Amino acid sequence: PIKPEIWRDKKIPEIKDLIHDKKVKKVVLARELILTANKEIPIETILEKLKEKNATSMIFNIDGFIGASPELLVSRFGNAVRANPLAGTATRHREENADNQSRQELLDSTKDAYEHKVTIEWLLKELLPFCSFIDADPEPRIMSLPHVHHLGTEVTGQLSQPAASILELVTALHPTPAVAGDPQTEALKIIKDIEGIDRRRYAGPVGWVDSSGNGEFAVGIRSAEILGKKAHLYAGVGLVADSEPQSELNETRSKFQTMLSTFLEL
């Protein structure tokens, strides 16, 4: 993995230069943390612990890719379609006043509001061709998780006939600016050139589909790839023009805690 200081002092400024040069509006830069155990990692035990602590998240295990995702990429039941993208993050605090202040600072942050707006506008644009009606909450709401607060906006719509299947919707929406960037093609190239890690299945769509084309898919974040005695953990941040490198590094540390705290209990 790349050292935190190099990630903060070299990679973030490199991407911010590209943003300032108008090459791209937003890029999601990820970090990798590798844990090594002295025996095979017990996936079932980890899933149980994730379930206990993350009641509102989708708990998943796909052949050793495990996690507790709070972010709904898209669901489709009949003609009804729903998404709940998350972009914009603040760290949670044990002390109530500090935690309330963190929430309020997130709501007041112009940087986080812009990062969120980029994601919502992109998602509405991509969903619109499939829908006869689509709507989004006028303002983002706070989603509070055990280690972080997020800005989230619920998007709902009615599919045009013949209704697209969940897999068609997933294909159209992945990867969103919440895990890649905007514009998508340019952001993905920058990630490939600069990020310097193998994301494996991190941030990929995870979910289920039935024979009628209904289903529900989350974004594969707050996740780890288990390979024998090793666990590869991932956390990403959305970089925009106003991003501050140390704050972004702190944000990855908070996001790692979902999985890291679970592994450290073993």
Task: Show which residues each predicted segment covers.
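Short, well-ordered strand-loop elements centered on a beta-strand within folded domains, enriched
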Residues: 66, 78-87, 133-136, 214-220, ...
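Extreme N-terminus nucleophile/cap motif
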Residues: 23-27, 32, 36-49, 53, ...
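ATP-grasp fold ATP-binding core
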Residues: 21-30, 60-62, 119-121
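Structural motif
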Residues: 26-27, 56-59, 80-81, 117, ...
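SIR2/sirtuin-family catalytic core signature
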Residues: 36-82
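A short, polar/proline- and glycine-enriched secondary-structure boundary/capping micro-motif
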Residues: 78, 92-98, 242-247
